[in-house]
């Protein structure tokens, strides 16, 4: 793992921020009380429909603080900012002025404050209101399947009403819409669809919109983590959480929305990002007074603590499950999955998988099915897991230890299932003997797809053991395409063929943070033997120390 960027300290998103990053023309005009100039500047950068922009909380607090003469545009700005901060009393005051239309703001307010069992957004006769309400309701109800359908429809929607609104700078809004459409579609695909599509859309989003738009940070981090979910290395500098904590970060509501959109993927990180984001979300939800936002955040705090070794009682899982019984389908998925992760009971995973399927939450479905195949392979799970892996691109299911992924791959191969996804799932499992077994079942099966057999040969080349290299030499004598692929790998003359099985096993455990004593106990060997294996591995890899050897080993695995 080479992801860089330390977590920021806890942040109060309601605390005052300086105005250092605002345009000089805006702050200078305010300093000399030139209110027409201030209004003119604001109309180019302040959008009451999408309040979170390049200047973040600095601009929002400036608009609330500056003593501008009141008019309908300023009231609309401030009413939207009140929604962003959960200032429901302030919102009531702005609505009472009769200077602005209430339906949009009231609809969003009611969605935020809706109970756990809410399953549909407020009704409206206007199409642009229905579309806006559905987005918020999908987010607060975690209705992944419905959200994915919404995200696919959204690019075709063109709101004529924008041209008649003075509180929306149309140029910036149109550029932002292209960015938002790509990011939301990427998020929807990452949670409930195709990871290759999600990665491509996230990459495209990085080129859209204006510079410093926070949605670009979402796209950047999502692209990195989706690539890892597809089997790639986890590398790059993640910046979303630091952006949220900065003065130009998003409003409280916007921060909850964007952090929730990538929350499951924070579980890949071992730096506390998941709990940091979940606790921030809980603080926001409490200040907003949102039952559904608070329930989601509490659930993710429990997930982070369970991943850290805490028991179900310590994280209050029983209370979450009790609340989940009456909740909308999307809100039930993670609590049910957590119950299964704690109990390891196949029946609990089956219930979690059913809930995930109902909500359209593909990531949770893949997780539950992977555990089921590893624990208790049955015909239905053996049929559906490889189909989902192939169609969605998942290779590192969330909340699935590498050893469980390896067991699932072996179970699929032993049951006669063949596919590139199965070979790659075995590879990320990190157990050389399992990868060899799965690869050989594909290579020896003449009925296996050509792409899967080629992937199996490639997997043998990546394992990095003497045994795997011997197998490749044997395969290279074949006269078919498999033999040609083996000869090409052998011709590369890479280092990774020099490690023994035991050296590989010891180095793999060392890179996961185990001490020599821990490894010795795990493998029933002496600490002296472990030290010798590590020394041999370092020498063969040309590594100066244990950490460098672990890093080179990880490169070999990828």
Where in the sequence are the language-model features?
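Structural detector for internal amphipathic alpha-helices that build alpha-solenoid repeat scaffolds
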Residues: 40-48, 334-342, 367-374, 423-430, ...
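Helix-turn-helix DNA-binding segment
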Residues: 437, 441, 451-454, 488-535, ...
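Alpha-helical repeat scaffolds
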Residues: 56-63, 88-99, 116-123, 143-154, ...
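Inter-helical turn/loop elements of alpha-helical hairpins
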Residues: 3-7, 11-121, 133-145, 189-200, ...
């Amino acid at each position: 793992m080479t992801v860089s960027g330390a977590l920021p300290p806890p942040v109060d998103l309601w605390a005052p921020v300086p105005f250092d990053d605002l345009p000089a023309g805006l702050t200078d005009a305010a300093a000399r009380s030139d209110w027409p100039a201030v209004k003119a500047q604001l109309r180019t950068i302040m959008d009451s429909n999408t309040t979170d922009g390049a200047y973040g909380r600095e601009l929002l607090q400036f608009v609330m603080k500056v003593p501008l003469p009141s008019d309908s545009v300023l009231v609309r700005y401030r009413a939207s900012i009140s929604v962003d901060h959960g200032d429901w009393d302030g919102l009531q005051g702005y609505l009472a002025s009769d200077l602005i239309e209430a339906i949009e703001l009231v609809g969003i307010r009611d969605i935020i404050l809706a109970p756990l069992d809410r399953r549909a957004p407020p009704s409206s006769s206007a199409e642009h209101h229905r579309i806006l309400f559905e987005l918020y309701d999908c987010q607060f109800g975690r209705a992944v399947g419905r959200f994915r359908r919404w995200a696919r429809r959204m690019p075709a929607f063109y709101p004529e009403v924008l041209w008649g609104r003075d509180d929306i700078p149309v140029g910036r809004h149109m550029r932002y819409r292209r960015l938002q459409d790509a990011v939301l579609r990427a998020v929807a695909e990452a949670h409930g669809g195709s990871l290759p599509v999600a990665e491509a859309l996230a990459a495209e989003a990085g080129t859209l919109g204006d510079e410093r738009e926070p949605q670009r940070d979402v796209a950047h981090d999502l692209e990195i983590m989706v690539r890892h979910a597809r089997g790639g290395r986890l590398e790059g500098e993640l910046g979303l959480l630091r952006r949220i904590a900065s003065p130009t970060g998003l409003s409280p509501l916007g921060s909850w929305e964007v952090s929730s959109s990538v929350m499951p993927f924070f579980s890949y990180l071992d730096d506390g990002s998941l709990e940091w984001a979940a606790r921030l979300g809980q603080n926001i939800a409490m200040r907003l007074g949102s039952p559904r936002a608070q329930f989601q955040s509490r659930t993710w705090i429990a997930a982070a603590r369970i991943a850290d070794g805490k028991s179900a009682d310590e994280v209050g899982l029983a209370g979450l499950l009790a609340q989940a019984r009456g909740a909308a389908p999307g809100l039930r998925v993670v609590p049910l999955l957590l119950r299964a992760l704690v109990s390891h009971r196949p029946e609990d995973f089956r219930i979690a998988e059913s809930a995930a399927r109902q909500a359209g939450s593909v990531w949770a479905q893949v997780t539950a099915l992977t555990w089921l195949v590893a624990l208790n392979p049955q015909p239905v799970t053996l049929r559906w897991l490889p189909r989902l892996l192939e169609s969605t691109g998942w290779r590192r299911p969330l909340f699935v230890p590498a050893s469980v992924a390896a067991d699932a791959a072996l179970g699929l191969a032993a049951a006669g299932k063949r596919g590139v996804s199965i070979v790659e799932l075995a590879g990320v499992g990190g157990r050389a003997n399992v990868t060899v077994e799965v690869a050989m079942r594909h290579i020896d099966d003449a009925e296996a797809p050509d792409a899967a057999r080629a992937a199996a040969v490639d997997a043998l080349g990546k394992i990095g053991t003497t045994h795997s290299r011997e197998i490749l030499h044997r395969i290279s004598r074949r006269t078919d395409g498999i033999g040609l692929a083996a000869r090409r790998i052998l011709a590369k003359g890479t280092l990774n063929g020099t490690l023994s099985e035991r050296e590989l096993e010891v180095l793999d455990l060392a890179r996961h943070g185990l001490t020599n004593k821990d490894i010795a106990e795990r493998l029933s060997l002496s600490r002296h033997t472990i030290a010798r294996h590590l020394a041999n591995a370092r020498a063969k890899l040309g590594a100066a120390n244990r950490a460098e050897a672990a890093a080179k080993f990880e490169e070999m695995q990828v």
